[in-house]
């Protein structure tokens, strides 16, 4: 009997429901009235869940429509829809606020299952974390997405309206010239008018999105404060229970409201930034086409990811996998082309599974394409593929890329001496610092400006500059009698002011006191300084092995004993020395110290490095002597140094200075001021001598502050050398 009544009721109501759906205007009116009813009428929890679900679904639907339309005006109803959806979401905020304040004391489940689920999921037992997550979501929506969307719509509306007269004149010109008829002209004018109306409406509608984001913040505060007061003073809830209950509900309500708001704001930006597209290609296809248009960009991304995968501490597998994937896609695209790649995949699937995946009309018989080139054997194809992959994956350790006008500098047949200069650099680095830098790969790069060059370390640009191959660089070192004419520039290695002068003015420049440098020397000097700057990066495990093998020829016992020490520890000590410009020529002393100390300190690199530095006192003192044979230095006053010693904090075997902002600023200013006085006297580098316990921590602090000061300790000075104190740094901490 009940089934019969249900069938009868359904039979009577379905025609009404059908007419309601067919009458679109009536459906919209009912929807708007329902929004107003939501604001006024209290709703049971299951109805509220239903309405919140509709809100999320609508936002997802809108952003998908925004992605699939060909041009913005295809979604001309979007500004009005934006207003209605915003009103609907604010009505839901009112309804959920009412429910939270009136039913929240009964527990989260009495309000809404969706709100409770979102709240408990995000909070995860920690209300502070939940509040932070919600705050981040609100700030991202308000400050990033909403502000960006609003600005885009404003600018797009302004440009669309400014372009109206020109577009109208273009339509009239086409009509007058007979390129289009009256019907086509009317169609274009209508589309132009629709575009102007759309962007004008979007300019105003975007303000709804921003207002909605601000309103949600205020509503959230009301829910928390109001709910807490209601729970404590009206429902006699404890402070903790009231706070936990209403925090869960408020955060859940905020998330349920903010997620659709964020999606709608994103959809607004997508629609506003869409350009008129080709009808033959949708947005997603065009996006993929443009992202993969240049296979070399995929190669660069993949190579960089593989490089990052070699850095300790980073996720090796993830970076290597994604990097290899990018390189593989780039290789496939460069070899087959995007269309050819898809065609090949389509043919393979068709043959393998008997599927017809072609979208184009075709005959029942498929005629094979006649080969236009000689068929390659599988071995040849495999060899070419391996060579292509090897070429893509190979990263030169040190590379010098030249613009096409600079190629002559490296061509000995044309009188270029750049290669000879580079060989001289390798000898000089080996003599001064004690390691052999790798060969520099010199190649041309047509993508560079003609007179520019780049120096790369492991595929990453570490320096670049510009030289004029037919001119000379004239540098004013402070002894110029009279300035000469030239093209102003910056010397790339040291950043000093200089001039590019013609060869005919070279002798005159020398007479007037300028230092003259030829283009090859400019590049070579820049390369040399960069090698010194990044010297620690050249100490690979292979280089450590080579250093030990050379030392073993004369001192086999110490090298054999050092095999008990991990190669990584030896390498880290060498890198730490080079990082602070300490030569590693005296490998015998370095290795003896490491083998003596390492077992006692469990191979701790920090302690080993400081002990090695103390044993290298003669090397360090000699490295920083002035031309007159004296080590000229600065020191701290007793009070200042004692203050810094008191601020040292130990972190395992390392130490750091624990200074507040004011103390750190005073330290930086005090050291910088005295260092500048030393530099003005023509003395470089600036040496600062401190207590051994303070040296490493202060050196790290100076490096972070980008103050070019060499920090040495008393233990690192050769007592038999000559010294000259240049001043004392007094800091009133």
From Swiss-Prot:
Subcellular compartments: Cell membrane
Region Disordered, annotated ranges: 360-381
Keywords: Bacterial flagellum biogenesis, Bacterial flagellum protein export, Cell membrane, Membrane, Protein transport, Transmembrane, Transmembrane helix, Transport
KW Membrane (keyword) present: yes
Membrane topology: Multi-pass membrane protein
Record-stated family: Belongs to the FHIPEP (flagella/HR/invasion proteins export pore) family.
Function summary: Involved in the export of flagellum proteins.
UniProt protein name: Flagellar biosynthesis protein FlhA
Organism: Helicobacter pylori (strain J99 / ATCC 700824) (Campylobacter pylori J99)
Gene: flhA
């Amino acid at each position: 009997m009940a089934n019969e009544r249900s069938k009868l009721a359904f039979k009577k109501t379905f025609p009404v429901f059908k007419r309601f759906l067919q009458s679109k205007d009536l459906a919209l009116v009912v929807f708007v009235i329902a929004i107003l009813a939501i604001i006024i009428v209290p709703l049971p929890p299951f109805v509220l869940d239903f309405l919140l679900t509709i809100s999320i679904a609508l936002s997802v639907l809108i952003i998908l429509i925004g992605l699939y339309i060909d041009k913005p005006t295809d979604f001309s109803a979007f500004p009005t829809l934006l207003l209605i959806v915003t009103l609907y979401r604010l009505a839901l905020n009112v309804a959920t606020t009412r429910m939270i304040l009136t039913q929240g004391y009964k527990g989260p489940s009495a309000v809404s299952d969706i709100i409770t689920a979102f709240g408990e999921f995000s909070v995860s037992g920690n209300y502070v974390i939940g509040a932070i997550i919600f705050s981040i979501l609100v700030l991202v929506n308000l400050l990033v997405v909403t502000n960006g969307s609003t600005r885009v719509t404003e600018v797009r509306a302004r440009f669309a309206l400014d372009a109206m007269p020109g577009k109208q004149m273009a339509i009239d010109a086409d009509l007058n010239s007979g390129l289009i008829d009256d019907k086509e002209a009317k169609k274009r004018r209508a589309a132009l008018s629709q575009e102007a109306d759309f962007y004008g409406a979007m300019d105003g509608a975007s303000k709804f999105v921003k207002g909605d984001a601000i309103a949600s913040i205020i509503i959230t505060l009301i829910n928390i404060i109001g709910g807490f007061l209601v729970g404590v003073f009206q429902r006699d809830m404890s402070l903790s229970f009231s706070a936990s209950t209403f925090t869960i509900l408020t955060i859940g309500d905020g998330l349920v409201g903010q997620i659709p708001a964020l999606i709608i704001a994103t959809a607004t930006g997508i629609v506003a930034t869409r350009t008129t597209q080709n009808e033959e290609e949708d947005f997603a296809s065009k996006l993929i086409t443009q992202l993969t248009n240049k296979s070399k960009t995929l190669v660069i991304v993949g190579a960089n990811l593989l490089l990052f995968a070699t850095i300790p501490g980073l996720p090796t597998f993830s970076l290597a996998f994604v990097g290899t994937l990018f390189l593989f896609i780039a290789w496939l695209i460069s070899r087959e082309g995007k269309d050819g790649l898809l065609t090949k995949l389509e043919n393979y699937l068709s043959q393998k599974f008997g599927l017809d995946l072609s979208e184009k009309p075709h005959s029942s018989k498929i005629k094979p394409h006649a080969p236009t080139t000689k068929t390659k054997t599988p071995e040849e194809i495999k060899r070419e593929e391996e060579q292509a992959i090897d070429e893509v994956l190979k990263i030169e350790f040190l590379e010098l890329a030249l613009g096409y006008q600079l190629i002559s500098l490296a061509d000995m047949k044309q009188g270029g001496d750049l290669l000879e200069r580079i060989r001289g650099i390798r000898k000089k680095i080996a003599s001064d610092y004690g390691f052999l830098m790798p060969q520099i790969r010199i190649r041309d790069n047509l993508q560079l400006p003609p007179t520019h060059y780049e120096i790369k370390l492991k595929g990453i640009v570490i320096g670049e500059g510009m030289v004029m191959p037919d001119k000379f660089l004239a540098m004013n070192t402070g002894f110029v009698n009279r300035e000469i004419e030239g093209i102003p520039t910056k010397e790339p290695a040291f950043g000093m002011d200089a001039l590019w002068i013609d060869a005919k003015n070279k002798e005159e420049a020398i007479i007037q006191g300028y230092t003259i440098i030829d283009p090859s020397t400019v590049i070579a000097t820049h390369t040399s300084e960069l090698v010194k700057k990044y010297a620690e990066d050249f100490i690979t495990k292979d280089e450590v092995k080579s250093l030990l093998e050379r030392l073993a020829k004369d001192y086999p016992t110490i090298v054999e004993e050092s095999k008990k020490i991990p190669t990584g520890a030896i390498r880290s000590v060498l890198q730490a020395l080079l990082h602070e410009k300490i030569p590693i020529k005296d490998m015998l002393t370095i290795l003896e110290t490491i083998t003596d100390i390492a077992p006692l300190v469990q191979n701790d690199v920090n302690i080993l490095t400081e002990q090695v530095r103390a044993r290298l006192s003669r090397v360090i003192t000699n490295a920083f002597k002035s031309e007159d044979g004296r080590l000229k230095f600065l020191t701290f006053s007793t009070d200042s140094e004692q203050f810094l010693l008191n601020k040292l904090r130990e972190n395992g075997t390392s130490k750091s200075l624990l200074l507040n902002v004011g103390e750190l600023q005073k330290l930086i200013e005090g050291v910088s001021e005295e260092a500048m006085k030393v530099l003005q006297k023509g003395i470089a580098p600036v040496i600062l001598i401190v207590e051994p316990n303070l040296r490493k921590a202060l050196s790290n602090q100076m490096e972070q502050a980008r103050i070019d000061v060499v920090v040495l300790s008393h233990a690192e000075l050769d007592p038999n050398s000559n010294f000259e104190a240049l001043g004392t740094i007094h800091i009133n901490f």
